[in-house]
Amino acid sequence: MKSDIEICQTATLTRMKTIASNLGLHDDDITPQGPFKAKVNIDALKRLKSEPNGKLILVSAITPTPLGEGKTVTTIGLAQGLAKLGESVSACIRQPSMGPVFGVKGGAAGGGYSQVAPMEELNLHLTGDIHAITAAHNLASAAIDARIYHEQRLGYDVFSEKNELPALRIDPQHVVWKRVMDHNDRALRMVTIGKNEDGKTINGYEREDGFDITAASELMAILALATDLQDLRQRIGRIVVAYNLDGEPVTTEDLQVAGAMTVTMKFAINPTLMQTLEGVPTFVHSGPFANIAHGNSSIIADNIALKLTDYTVTEGGFGSDMGFEKACNIKAPLSEKSPDCAVLVATLRGIKANSGLFPLSPGQSLPKELFAPNKEALDAGLDNLLWHINNCAKYGLPVVVAINRFPEDTQEELDSLLNWVSNLDMNVDVAISEAFVKGGNGTLELAEKVIKACQQETQFTPLYTSEMSLFDKLNAVAIKGYGAERIELSEKAQQQLATFEKLGYQSLSVCMAKTPASISTDGNIKGAPTDFIVPIRELKLCAGAGFIYALCGNVMTMPGLPEKPAFMNLDIDGDGNIVGLS
């Protein structure tokens, strides 16, 4: 079989104006970005406002191996399968960060014959939204240090009188807004800025700082959760970047930089329209990670897609304890549209990996034993699959398990898994997906079962309400969402929690940043652990995004590169063809 990029480069694609027209978009709704992608003007929603919403299908997965279990392949393949059945359908996915593209996982366009195309354009820059977010974010960083420099250089009173601006009196030791870049670079996690020659301050005042990956920026979450340009502007203005010498929050509005940040992101608020290899329209917008942010594509993209097609297929990052949980508890209440069906992706290798019988390490190849028949490992890993089925069902949604088939899978083990799921006494269906090898033809049975599931009445119920305290919300996610015994706040986190509630932020949602390698916060614990403790070492306020960000365990907001990064495989030939991208 050809490589992903070879399949994509030899595919016959439809011009984007035709894709948009067939979708119901007008010429003035789109701004073409070359022949095969276009920006969709958010104003299209005003014209479509009276149209009914279609069905929203949310794709999730079991606890994944480091290489993933094929959520995006299934998302794209399912959309193609629905189209082959004659249904009106679109897909919504996140824009890939170049960190993973050059790091461990590679691209995020799907794979095989279920890809978004052109995949090299999707995986590398696309229409520049991530770069716009990086620029807007770092503009705020520059504004913070410039304000500290000028206020301290002149003195607060002189600065205020000279510039007719209030002195913000930012505490340099209490700046909470790190800089960002769209690469994995562990050397930038902790840096010292403002270094000068002895006795000089021309480079600013020295302080400790650091970098996060752009996908972890609050601006990325804001872009994904904003409902229109005005909402984007208001959310950016609420961002807390530092605290003053009295412990009071300093916002981007206080710095008078929020307007310029929004201007920098003006074009980024418009989703990018692409297509699958089979011509299914696909909206690509925003890219928050699910382990260090809320891990879902944008509300704006969903809203446009839901107005234009009868079915919209989207995905939440990592397992159902991660992006799916955050879609239900953070995204859905803001979008006022809950999912109609959950599709849970499982693989034989992923189930075996959750048996706990094999060592798994990020950046390393999967043990070869995962690809061989092994009844003991398969049986031992079923607890994880059952946990994720129950987790999706607890939100009041019908569940369809999609078994993503790999070439080495045996029919005997596949039949065993099909029978096991079919015999569960609950509202769950199951089908094998061969989206990677067969495209939409490999998901026809899955598509039929998803259509059937979408006809059911849902009883969607998030885990918590906005009226609950922040502590109770954190406990709700840990206990109801993960099956933990309780949360355990560090002394620092306790102080931060008290501060946030004192400042009036108790109505915000909570976003857990934890390892995706386990339902718990310890990536070495596989299966379906119970009665464990969720340690929260630090809390971060994301007032613009509308959530409190809880750092659990040792999760990093700036990834590092592995021993053998994916960028080693990339090159370009004399004709400009990219090779080695996956």
Curated annotation (Swiss-Prot):
GO molecular function list: ATP binding; formate-tetrahydrofolate ligase activity
EC numbers for this chain: 6.3.4.3
Question: Known InterPro entries for this protein?
Answer: Formate_THF_ligase, Formate_THF_ligase_CS, P-loop_NTPase
Instruction: State the pathway, as annotated in the record.
Output: One-carbon metabolism; tetrahydrofolate interconversion
The UniProt annotation places ATP binding at 65-72
Q: Which GO terms describe its biological process?
A: tetrahydrofolate interconversion
What PROSITE patterns does this protein map onto? FTHFS_1, FTHFS_2
Give the catalysed reaction(s), semicolon-separated: (6S)-5,6,7,8-tetrahydrofolate + formate + ATP = (6R)-10-formyltetrahydrofolate + ADP + phosphate
Alphabetically sorted, this entry's keywords are:
ATP-binding, Ligase, Nucleotide-binding, One-carbon metabolism
User: In terms of domain of life, where is this protein from?
Assistant: Bacteria
EC class: ligase
Q: Quote the HAMAP family the UniProt record gives.
A: FTHFS
For this chain, the family text in UniProt reads:
Belongs to the formate--tetrahydrofolate ligase family.
Q: What protein name is recorded for this chain?
A: Formate--tetrahydrofolate ligase
- Species source reads Aliivibrio fischeri (strain ATCC 700601 / ES114)
